[in-house]
Each structure stands twice: as structure tokens, then as C-alpha cells.
Regions:
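Active-site loop/oxyanion-hole signature of alpha/beta-hydrolase fold enzymes
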Residues: 70-119
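Flexible "cap/lid" loop of the alpha/beta hydrolase fold
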Residues: 129-133, 137-168
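Acidic catalytic loop of the alpha/beta-hydrolase fold
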Residues: 234-239, 263-264
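Short alpha-helix in the alpha/beta-hydrolase fold that links the catalytic acid
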Residues: 226, 240-249
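Conserved HGGG/HGGXW glycine-rich cap/lid loop of the alpha/beta-hydrolase fold
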Residues: 23-84
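Short beta-strand/loop motif that positions the catalytic acidic residue
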Residues: 224, 230-232
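Catalytic active-site module of serine/aspartate enzymes centered on a nucleophile-bearing elbow/loop
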Residues: 253-285
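Conserved alpha/beta-hydrolase catalytic His-Asp/Glu region
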Residues: 153-155, 169-222
Length: 285
């Protein structure tokens, strides 16, 4: 596979790494060609629900030249490999399963989680936080964009979970995409979500939606020891700021960082913001 980022000053590889219980997660890895940068702390990137790596291209093109980056896809993504003969069920997409996957994947990559910085978005942010509070994951720091305190779907979308997955394609085109266009103010954010939804594995989309419906993150956040920056965007109308602020308040080392837009978090301009926050962390943290 060619590097999805194009020509960058970094060595690229892609492979499926071990997840929990025989699942295998597609993982993109980059190591800077600059010898000093290649020795930097690794960054583990966990993107949002059904997100595709191309949506992060403006950020990653710059970042992979500065830090070793490992972009791990969660198990609802369409390139994830499930165990042979396994009949997929909603419980396969429970939040704790994502955490167990990530812990196994980090080990398979030969990384020491305590020496890594995490970067997550939406579902990815939520999975990282859940892993921290349950003691499944560890890290040096985590920069988390719009983690979900709860998964709130519009009332009209709930009946979708009762339908066969093969009916999702017309539903996404006729209802979900127009809804997103009305709901999302940022054009670039809408384009990313549209692309993600149209390329999603529909069966896994249905199963993970059913599993996420009853999820809440609140209990146990006070146990998280890893410093966490909770990043919110002023113009992001899809993710609730109230939830992010509550999460930051409950985290012993939580801090709110506001940026101009959701698109900004997908571009190289967010790198100095992350670096400035990480520079303030004391060695003991």
C-alpha cells in the first residue's frame, strides 16, 4: 500500500496488529527520516467512529516528520479483521473491547505505553479515557478532542438500530447525510463525516451504534492518573462542550483547551498547541 500521506520525510509501513480475542487492527506507522526526530516519544493516534486516515492528512503530513506516529484503527473500521468464523455481535463493540484491543496492539507494536503520548478524537478519545480509568491503558499524556461523555443520537435515528444492516445504505444517504449537513456548521467537518459514513462497514456500524447507545463515561474518571488535555472547538456544533468541560473537571489532571474550529484539530496548526501543553507537564507526570 502506498503512503496515504504522499511524499513526506518519514518511513511508512502498514500492517494488521493483534487486538483482543483474535481481532486484528489495521495500523499505519511512520518514523521520521531525521535521526533525532526518530528518537522522539511515539504518538499513538486513535481517530473517531468510522473515521478514515485521509481526514487527518493535513495534520499527519507535518507531524510524522517530527515524531514517530502509530495510527491504530478501532475495530468498527471496515479494514479490521475479525476472528475466522466469528459471528459479530453488539458486545464485540463495547467500549472495554476497544480498550483491550488498544492495549494488545500497543504491546504488539513493541511500545512502552508509559513513554507514549496519546492523541484521540471522539470515539477514539472516549476509548482512551475508558482505558485509563479501568487501568487497561497507560500513557505519558493524552490530547483528546471532543470525548463523548454519552452517545446521544437524535430520536429519529434510534429506529435505525432495529433495521437490518443492509438497509443502512439508503438511510445514510437519504437521512443521515442531510442531517449532518444541517447540523454541522464547518464545511470541512461535514465533508469528513460524509466520507466516513459512506465508507463505513454497515454491519459494524449497526452493531457499534446499538452498543454505544447506553454508554456513559462518568463513573471512575477521578481514578485517571494520566494528564489529559480535553480539546474543544468553538464552532463544533456536533460535540457538546458541556460534556467535555465536565470530563475535564472530573479528571485529576484534566485541562480544557479551546481551539478555533474542529478543522483546526485536523491541521498542522494544532501541533504547537499540543507541544505547548506537553511542555508544561512536569517530569514526575
Amino acid at each position: 500500500m502506498e503512503d496515504p500521506l504522499g511524499e513526506v520525510a518519514a518511513d511508512f509501513s502498514v500492517r494488521h496488529v493483534s487486538g483482543a480475542d483474535g481481532w486484528r487492527l489495521r495500523t499505519f506507522s511512520w518514523t521520521p527520516t531525521d535521526a533525532e526526530a526518530a528518537e522522539g516519544r511515539p504518538v499513538i493516534v486513535i481517530a473517531g467512529w468510522t473515521s478514515v486516515v485521509e481526514g487527518w492528512k493535513p495534520l499527519l503530513q507535518k507531524w510524522v516528520e517530527q515524531r514517530p506516529i502509530h495510527y491504530i484503527e478501532t475495530r468498527e473500521k471496515n479494514r479490521t479483521e475479525s476472528p475466522a468464523g466469528h459471528r459479530q455481535r453488539p458486545v464485540d463493540f463495547e467500549m472495554v473491547q476497544h480498550c483491550r484491543d488498544l492495549a494488545t496492539a500497543v504491546h504488539d507494536l513493541g511500545l512502552d505505553a508509559e513513554e507514549c503520548d496519546w492523541f484521540g478524537s471522539s470515539l477514539g478519545s472516549t476509548a482512551i479515557l475508558h482505558g485509563f480509568k479501568e487501568g487497561i491503558l497507560d500513557g505519558r499524556s493524552a490530547f483528546l478532542i471532543a470525548p463523548n461523555g454519552e452517545f446521544k443520537f437524535p430520536g429519529w435515528a434510534i429506529p435505525f438500530t432495529w433495521l437490518p444492516w443492509w438497509l443502512y445504505a439508503p438511510g445514510i444517504r437519504l437521512l443521515v447525510i442531510p442531517y449532518l449537513k444541517l447540523r454541522i456548521k464547518e464545511k470541512e467537518q461535514y465533508i469528513r463525516y460524509r466520507r466516513s459514513m459512506l465508507s463505513a462497514d454497515l454491519k459494524r456500524l449497526k452493531l457499534s451504534t446499538k452498543m454505544n447507545l447506553g454508554y456513559t463515561i462518568w463513573e471512575g474518571l477521578e481514578k485517571v492518573k494520566v494528564p489529559c488535555a480535553i480539546c474543544v472547538a468553538a464552532s463544533d456544533t456536533l460535540h457538546g462542550h458541556g460534556e467535555s468541560e465536565r470530563i475535564a473537571e472530573l479528571l485529576p489532571r484534566g485541562e480544557i483547551i479551546e481551539v478555533p474550529s474542529n478543522q483546526f484539530t485536523h491541521e498542522a496548526g494544532v501541533i504547537p498547541v499540543i507541544q505547548a501543553w506537553q511542555a508544561e507537564l512536569t517530569p514526575t507526570e
